[in-house]
Every structure is written in C-alpha cells, then in structure tokens.
A protein has these predicted regions:
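Residues forming the flavin
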Residues: 1-209
Length: 209
C-alpha cells in the first residue's frame, strides 16, 4: 500500500498565507498543539504570541474538491469529521469562551454515527457551521490576526476576524506511487489512484492484482 500524504497549502500561499502567517495552521499542526505530547503540552495557544485564542476558523476542502486551484476534484472523506473532532476538543481545552466556526461547502458525515457526532457538535458543543465560499484571507495589524471575507448562503459578502485559521487539508497520492505503478504494470487514473472498474473496485488493470 503506497499510503497517502496531506496536501501542501503553501502551493496556494497567495490565498491562504500559510507560510507567511504563523497563525494559519494545517489540521495536522493544530492537532499537535492539542496533543499532550505536543509543543505546548496540550495548552491551546496561538503560535504568534502564545496567547489563548478567542475565535478559531476551520476552512474545509483545502486541496480537495477543487479543480480550479489544485486539480484535486475528489473528496478526501476524512476532513469533515476530523475538523468537527478538533473543534470539540479545542473547546474542551480552552480555559475561557472559545468560538469555533467551520466554513464549508457541505458537511459529509457518511460513516456510522457520524451524523450524530456532527449534530452533537452543532447542538450541544456550540460549534458553528457556516456554509460559505471564502473570498479572501488577510492579515490584519501587527498582532497577525486574520480577516476572512466570505460569501454567505444568501449571496452577501461578510467579514469576520479570527485568532487562528486551520486549513483542513485533503489527502493525495504520494508522488512515488507513479513509479511503483509503472513497475507493477498497473494503470492509474488522472489523480494517480489505481484505475478500477465500477463493479470491481478492488481489482486493478493487471490480472491478479
């Protein structure tokens, strides 16, 4: 199994400011902050000044379901649920009130009891789900706060300010997979996944593999 790797948002630096602003994190980096074995031993602070955040935004489908900017048109299938989980854990770790907003095209909760988990986050934990398209992300002031401008579901342009922005990065096939497939004589599709048939989803183009 060739495994997977997460999408590198630095490819879209002009839009996300991932490299230039320390308060823009990938989902994996944010999970390290929440971890007891992480750099802050589980204490929720933002990287730029080590202050506790009051507002955190998650941006879904970074590197997935996007053929205009990154070319990955598929859903990675894990990003929605790990964003919900991280938002709930962040609220548990916060010493004060913490506003968590997940900006999304839609929430895909297709696994067993995933919908219940989503509703628990929304109705009991107070996680806010905003169905919207992100227009721009800007750094505001010397303290490196972030302004998100977005189009809401009514088609109106809104803007909000956040202490941390978490990029829910999708998964993609490692570059080394192409060489492996060539050696095995297995055909790949345009996303470098093994090419299969609709009624034989685990059979490759090479018999017996």
């Amino acid at each position: 199994c060739p495994g997977s790797e997460h999408y590198d948002p630095s490819e879209l630096e002009a839009f996300y400011h991932y490299k230039s602003n320390p308060n823009v994190l990938t989902s994996l980096e944010f999970e390290r902050i929440l971890s007891a074995s992480g750099p802050t031993m589980g204490h929720l602070v933002r990287p730029s000044d080590e202050k506790e955040p009051k507002k955190i935004a998650w941006l879904q489908c970074v590197g997935s379901r996007d053929t205009n900017r990154c070319g990955n048109g598929y859903c990675s299938s894990v990003c929605c649920m790990y964003a919900i989980k991280d938002a709930m854990i962040a609220k548990e770790h916060a010493e004060g009130d913490l506003e968590c907003t997940i900006f999304n095209m839609d929430i895909r909760t297709f696994g067993k009891d995933y919908e219940k988990y989503y509703l628990r986050a929304k109705e009991k934990a107070g996680v806010r789900f905003e169905k919207a398209r992100i227009h721009t992300i800007d750094e505001v002031g010397k303290n490196k706060d972030l302004r998100i401008r977005y189009m809401d579901r009514n088609g109106e342009l809104q803007e909000e300010f956040y202490d941390i922005v978490v990029l829910s990065v999708g998964l993609q096939v490692p570059a080394s997979t192409a060489e492996l497939a060539k050696r095995l004589d297995v055909d790949l599709d345009k996303y470098n996944f093994a090419m299969t048939q609709p009624f034989a989803p685990v059979e490759t183009t090479r018999p017996g593999v």
